Amino acid sequence: LMGARCSKGIIDLLENRGVDILFDMTCTGLKREFHVEPDNLLQAYAWQLLNQVPCLRMVKAVNRENYMEGFRDRLDGILYHTVQFCDNYAYEYTDLKHRLDIPMLMVETDATKQCEGQIRTRVEAFIESLKIAKGASIGKKSLKKAEDGKMYVLGIDSGSTSTNAVILNENKEIVAFDVVRTGAKSGESAERILSEILERAGLKREDISLIVSTGYGRVSIPFADENVTEISCHGRGAHYFNPDVRTILDIGGQDSKAIRLNENGEVVDFVMNDKCAAGTGRFLEMMARTLEMDI
């Protein structure tokens, strides 16, 4: 973790996703635990203060790469945090991004509680890409089978306008699918679509081997076994339908994304903006209604 000071919410987000933070080199990240000499208190205290990671607004940070070398064998990636209008850190990020052979993700916040939700998708997608790079599997585990000996997996995409669900069997064949309006509470629409799609498929809840949620409301679906970012889902889906796809553009509701894939359909890199209504279903509906146009 590097860059400008970040909130506890960001650190909690990382730790809740199983991230081991090797070091916190933000300007307020290192612990202020000073071991001073009682006989030379002032000089010892001053020495400890001057050896803290400095703010880039005050002094140029040096020897950061030497510090990171000690973690090289355990360092999978770097989350670089900046605060809005604190532009000094963007220059250091650009320099490190080009010189270090380490995956890096820069996130910018405005020190408010709301911004933590905005960066959740990109942070989780970054973590997923790092796990895949290490050979870990996203959304794969030993699955139980239904009473008929078959395996069924349910996927739920919770969007701003609609909640979509599909059940696949072990041969990746569609058994049933359904679409309902999301409404005010994504959790309630997810419960409703679960009931409807099971009825369509003629299955019971215990017949489903795995439930995976995605979309902006994925964390609001309590019965999901796993939640995966739409970035990783885009990569898997595009590669399944066309293995030659290397670039995906997603004009979404909360943000827009540009995603780069490798030959295996794995997310190599991605960029996002923070605010975008271009692909929001409700925004499009309101504009169509205002312009008196049919969709």
Placement of each model-derived feature along the sequence:
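C-terminal hydrophobic structural anchor segments
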Residues: K60-D101
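Glycine-rich phosphate-binding loop plus the immediately following alpha-helix
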Residues: T182-S186, V268-I295
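Peripheral docking tails and interdomain loops at the edges
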Residues: Y91-K144
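N-terminal glycine/serine-rich phosphate-binding loop of ATP-dependent small-molecule kinases
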Residues: D148-E230
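Redox- and metal-dependent alpha/beta enzyme cores, enriched for Fe-S-associated oxidoreductases
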Residues: M2-Y67
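Short acidic, glycine/serine/threonine-rich loops at helix termini
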Residues: D12, V166-N169, A190, S220-D225, ...
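Conserved phosphate-binding catalytic cores of ATP/NTP-utilizing and phosphoryl-transfer enzymes
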Residues: K141-D148, Y216-N262, E266
